[in-house]
Every structure is written in C-alpha cells, then in structure tokens.
Curated annotation (Swiss-Prot):
NCBIfam families: PRK00094.1-2, PRK00094.1-3, PRK00094.1-4. The gene is gpsA. This is Glycerol-3-phosphate dehydrogenase [NAD(P)+]. It is an enzyme of class 1 (oxidoreductase). Belongs to the NAD-dependent glycerol-3-phosphate dehydrogenase family. GO terms for biological process: carbohydrate metabolic process; glycerol-3-phosphate biosynthetic process; glycerol-3-phosphate catabolic process; glycerophospholipid metabolic process; phospholipid biosynthetic process. NADPH binds at S11, F12, K32, K106, A141, R256, V280, E282. It catalyses: sn-glycerol 3-phosphate + NAD(+) = dihydroxyacetone phosphate + NADH + H(+); sn-glycerol 3-phosphate + NADP(+) = dihydroxyacetone phosphate + NADPH + H(+). Sn-glycerol 3-phosphate binds at K106, G137, S139, K192, D245, S255, R256, N257. It comes from Staphylococcus aureus (strain bovine RF122 / ET3-1).
Amino acid sequence: MTKITVFGMGSFGTALANVLAENGHDVLMWGKNQDAVDELNTCHTNKKYLKYAKLDVNIIATSDMTKAIQFADIYLMALPTKAMREVATQINDKLTSKKTFIHVAKGIENGTFKRVSEMIEDSISPEYNAGIGVLSGPSHAEEVVVKQPTTVAASSKDKNVSKLTQDLFMNDYLRVYTNDDLIGVELGGALKNIIAVASGIVAGIGYGDNAKAALMTRGLAEISRLGEKLGADPMTFLGLGGIGDLIVTCTSTHSRNFTLGYKLGQGESMDQALSEMNMVVEGIYTTKSVYHLAKEKNVDMPITNALYRVLFENISVKECVKDLMERDKKSE
C-alpha cells in the first residue's frame, strides 16, 4: 500500500484517484474549492466533473496544502497546464524531502513553450526531485471511472519512474504500457488537442467522414513534424500517446476540445461556448503556444495556423477551411 497525493480535483484527477484507491493505495486529493472538498468527503462524489460517479469511500480530500504535501512521497499532478507552475512552486516552498511527480496534463506553456515535465522540473529544487513522469493516452475520465477498458502509456526520463507509474495504476480495466520517449508522449498528448478542436469544428459545420478523416491524418502529420523537430521519436506518434489519444479526442463528445470546436462550427462565439462548458479547454492555450513555437522552429503546421486564426483573429471557420483546401499543390 502506497500513499499518494493527487493535486487537482478535476475529472481526470478524480477518476485516477479512484483507480489508485481501488488498487489499495491511500489517496488524498487536494483542491482549492472547499465545497468540492466537502462534497467528496461527505458524499464521495464530484458532480461538477463526474456527475453520476460514486467514488471509493477511502478517498479523502483537503484544501490544506501543507497537509497534502506531508501526506505522501508520490504526487499525481492533475492540474491544468496553466496552473502547473504556480502550484508546483507552492509545493516546492514547503518541501523537506524528495518526492516523485507524475503528471497527467496535456499542454504546452505559453511564452516558454515548455512541456509540463519541464515546468515541474523548473519549479522543484533538485534536492527534492526524485523523478518526474507522465501518464497519457486515450483515456476519457468518464469511462475510466466506470471501469471501461482503457490503455495508456507511462513515460519518464527515469525508467524507474515509468515502472512505478505502471505498478501504481495498472489493474484489470486500466492497462499501462511504459514508453521511453517522454518528449513524444507529452507532445502527443498536448498537440492532439489542437486537432481535436479543429475536428469539432468540422463536425459542427456538418462536413462528412471524408473531411474528418483527412483532418486527423494531416493533423497527425503536423504533430509528427513538430515532434521530430523537438527531439521526439516519430514512432511514438503511432502509439497510445499519439494516434491513440488523437482518435479518442477527435471523435468523442466527452472531449472538451472537440466540444468547443463543435460549438464554434455551429456558429457560437468562443466566449459563449466556454461559458456554457465551464471547464478548462487545453486546446485553446496549446494552439497559441504551438502557433508561435512552429514559427520559431520553421515547421509547417497549416491546421494549427488556421485554428489560431479562428480562435485569436476572429476569422470565420468556413473561410479557414476554404484557405486550407486551396493551399498550393504538394506531395503528401
């Protein structure tokens, strides 16, 4: 039995906390929202994010950062990318011993263009850092929490951290593979959110399967081009952290990124769509980061560029589709 603190009380953090508790581990969740903490401790639910799920009664929650830090030596960082550096810095300020960090965020930091493991590494003093890893792949929280068969990848620069992650989470409904390509697994998880928003737009407009298939295929090509430029193994993008995550996020209404895109394709404004969803949509922030990163690295990413224009320059979605279709002739 291992003690684990889960930082973040969103849908995926909650679903994975439930996995860990059912695997026999002691789990403490930390969140800022006292109402959510009280609900979990009293009712064993988190209805804002997982409306119908009843959670393991052994999971406890707190809003006390010091208590959360002292509880365990392994931390599951289940926070939005934009909050990761701030919370990791707060944790670091209170640490007195080494901790292992496993994150499940899928984004790239605006401005620095850093992957999430790099953000954590920046924020945690070396004397307190026992290793950093990621758990990623095609894994909707809504399915994990009701024990639908799910398969993901664990990756780290330290093989011991990858193996630890595999051992902690794997059970009869959650299969975990290890993968040595941390860069590729993190980039696959982040970049697919861009394509998922675009895929939602295509569905919202009402285009058919041909367009959806083309978008995912050419989207994967963009992901691979940038990934290879940044040091990833291109083969990683044919695995769970790449095409696996891409498929599930581009084809399901469980996906916040797809849902946002669908609403935009239906004619809603971004502000209107986000107010209805009331959740963090990582693809917005990732699109902004990757648009500028691709220009810096001189990588051709036409779908990302088109989505950036829709999200940040108020170009109509149909105009962007037209521009994509009328690009210069090229070989595949």
